[in-house]
Amino acid sequence: MTTASPATTPGIAQPLARYAAWRRAGDMVFLSGIIAVDPAASRIVRGYADIPDEAATLIGRTGEFSSDIKEGPILAQSWYVLDRIRQTIEAAGGQMSDVIKLVQYFKHLDHFPQYSRVRKLFFPGEPPASTVVEVTGMLPTADILIEVEATAYLPLR
């Protein structure tokens, strides 16, 4: 059985083109690539100011301009994307421990260590299988630093 994602999943950005945000095929749930675009504000997450204060503090906001301006964009986008994956998996009836595979696309591979720190917050136990790829660019603009696809094993109940 294959079903499309609900069109009105709260807080989940709709795709930028004609494709499903996620699909279920039997016990598997496949998420399309998720980028750091805030659907409520119609804007790209560019730093700590674009995510909740609690999240910014958790992922490493220091309050020092030179540190925050350098690491803030990738840390904030990483948190935002992984939180959207969490929300989507929960909307499908699962939890992050159901995620079995991630494919991570980076504009700059040197961002991987910062992303990895954030990913550990969402996967504190055994991490999912993972593929990391560097790409030259992502839609819709050059401000997008990361895109993540997820696959979850979520048996039908």
Where are these regions (language model features)?
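N-terminal presequence-like segments and the immediate start of the first folded domain
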Residues: 1-83, 87-101, 106-157
